[in-house]
């Protein structure tokens, strides 16, 4: 069995390959000792690690492991997944939306990191908790899917009520900027959480589009653990990317790009 692991700040992503079959699993980083114990019980032919906590795992296992830079691993794994899922892109920006967000440009040969922002899954969980008192990520994202942002976010069309706006009316003019106009509204937890996911998705997309224009590509690929159980975030980034004139791509199992890539990089 071959194992690739991306040990991130919040989640540990694990892929196992055996008999041409690939299986995926995740574990919370706070349970890293359990992952180490599991690894020490397996018959592993090849073990490759990446991510901020890769060194912690390597120091506590009884089998040899190779460690790779997470940006290179993510790019390698993403290329594999894009090919497997039928996407033939000459170049692209990829946004890895984990606890925070890292932005990269792939020119057809190699990747380079071109930016990063603190907006991502950490904001969804942290700000989401402050607004709802919900700590469980699945419960939080489940609730957000049914939310309505209309009384919370100020859209361009809300400003240009009787006039044709100079930019698309569905663009957000101010996240949470409509709240004071609707103080009599019922701001349900679902609505507030949907607005949190909205601002995360729009900030990530805006930054991705900015660097895409800088590098003269229209292709933006979105990956990362923040999309898990979060159809709303995927819809926000896809719709907003199209609205801003670029082409969005979502990759199934994209959160495992680093784990897959580590397994296929060679030292």
UniProtKB/Swiss-Prot annotation:
NCBIfam families recorded: panK_eukar (TIGR00555), PRK13317.1 (NF009842)
Protein name per its UniProtKB record: Type II pantothenate kinase
Phylogenetic classification of the source organism: Bacteria, Bacillati, Bacillota, Bacilli, Bacillales
Known role: Catalyzes the phosphorylation of pantothenate (Pan), the first step in CoA biosynthesis.
Pathway membership, UniProt: Cofactor biosynthesis; coenzyme A biosynthesis; CoA from (R)-pantothenate: step 1/5
Reaction(s) this enzyme catalyzes, per UniProt: (R)-pantothenate + ATP = (R)-4'-phosphopantothenate + ADP + H(+)
Keyword Ligase: no
GO annotation (BP), single: coenzyme A biosynthetic process
Listed EC numbers: 2.7.1.33
Name of encoding gene: coaW
């Amino acid at each position: 069995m071959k194992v690739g692991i991306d040990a991130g700040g919040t989640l540990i992503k694990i892929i196992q390959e055996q008999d041409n079959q690939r299986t995926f699993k995740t574990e919370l980083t706070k349970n890293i000792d359990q992952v180490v114990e599991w690894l020490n019980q397996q018959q592993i032919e090849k073990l490759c690690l990446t991510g901020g906590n890769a060194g912690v795992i390597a120091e506590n296992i009884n089998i040899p492991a190779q460690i790779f830079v997470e940006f290179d691993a993510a790019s390698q794994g993403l290329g594999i997944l894009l090919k497997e899922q039928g996407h033939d892109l000459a170049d692209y920006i990829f946004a890895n939306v984990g606890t925070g967000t890292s932005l990269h440009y792939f020119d057809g040969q190699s990747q380079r990191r071109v930016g990063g922002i603190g907006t991502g899954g950490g904001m969804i969980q942290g700000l989401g908790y402050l607004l709802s008192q919900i700590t469980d990520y699945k419960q939080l994202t489940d609730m957000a899917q049914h939310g309505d942002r209309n009384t919370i976010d100020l859209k361009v069309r809300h400003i240009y009520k009787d006039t044709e706006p100079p930019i698309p009316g569905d663009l957000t003019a101010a996240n949470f900027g409509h709240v004071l106009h609707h103080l009599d509204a019922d701001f349900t937890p679902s609505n507030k959480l949907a607005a949190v996911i909205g601002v995360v998705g729009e900030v990530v997309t805006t930054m991705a589009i900015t660097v895409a224009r800088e590098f003269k590509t229209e292709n933006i690929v979105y990956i990362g653990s923040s999309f898990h159980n979060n159809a709303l975030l995927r819809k926000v980034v896809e719709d907003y990317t199209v609205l801003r004139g670029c082409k969005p791509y979502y990759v199934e199992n994209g959160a495992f790009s680093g784990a897959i890539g580590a397994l296929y990089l060679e030292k």
